[in-house]
Curated annotation (Swiss-Prot):
Taxonomic source organism: Mus musculus (Mouse)
One Gene Ontology CC term in the entry: membrane
Glycosylation sites: 48
Cited InterPro entries: C19orf38_Ig, HIDE1
TM region positions: 121-141
Tree of life domain: Eukaryota
Signal peptide positions (record): 1-21
Full protein name: Protein HIDE1
Record-linked Pfam families: Ig_C19orf38
Statement: the UniProt record of this protein carries the keyword Membrane: yes
Compartment(s) where it occurs, according to its Swiss-Prot or TrEMBL record: Membrane
Amino acid sequence: MPWTILLFASGSLAIPAPSISLVPPYPSSHEDPIYISCTAPGDILGANFTLFRGGEVVQLLQAPSDRPDVTFNVTGGGSGGGGEAAGGNFCCQYGVMGEHSQPQLSDFSQQVQVSFPVPTWILALSLSLAGAVLFSGLVAITVLVRKAKAKNLQKQRERESCWAQINFTNTDMSFDNSLFAISTKMTQEDSVATLDSGPRKRPTSASSSPEPPEFSTFRACQ
């Protein structure tokens, strides 16, 4: 039994939801139109279809009297509008005349998502930018590491220089202390030697000694 007869008989508001699908040619860019087919059950002919995108009405179409489906050509943001097609989530709904010529609306169809492939140049540009950012990051990290190493090396050299200066100062102090000890010891030894010598008799020269007696030999006078 056709749905129209059932609707007139029962006045029910629960009529089947339509099916929705993309049909070729499929869009490859934002400038390409989007073709969406919306189909009611096979025995419902000449229904009025409404296409929604994100809860907003995009287009209204009536199916031919001998067909249960329509094909929407989305080329803009509104019904029949021109311009750039936009992707998103689409769904559709249809309506028929019920009892007492009251319009009866179906449930909403499933959603179909329309997206566009990323252009090659955008992908190449994104990869180039990502590579440039990565390279810049690596260069910055390398510079920071080298600066840190140079700073640590400079600190190590300063510490080594400080220790060398301290050791040199200690060596000089030890040498000065040794010289001072030797000088003090020599001074003490000289003082002791002076005290031990005391008054001594000066040696007399040979000229001051008493002259030895003169001896003479006399021969007898004959």
